[in-house]
């Protein structure tokens, strides 16, 4: 992840595969670790973070959400976007809130084949490690 207060600094961890279901008959060991730009959309406050606004997405992925997953978007984001005022959709994940609430954002991702042969295997939910947010907050606290 990157945070606004530390532009260009990345907080990284090994990427585990999304938790989900395959649409093909292959072993779970074929799942590639979480990858792609979907996390940008979700950490902004859309995608899985706004799953309660999308009946089809909720129907397909809702059972994969962690406990309290439907509330995660509203809990971890910081402000209602003016264009989404009628929906009261808030955006912008706050690292400090992730740490204080002991929650990580949720990201909806396709599950890809780690051998690159079968392409998309299915879909699922990924949560970045909470330690990334703790590390980011600690680094922010060291700024002058």
Predicted regions mapped to residue ranges:
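Anaerobic metallocofactor- and corrinoid-dependent redox/one-carbon enzyme cores
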Residues: 1-144
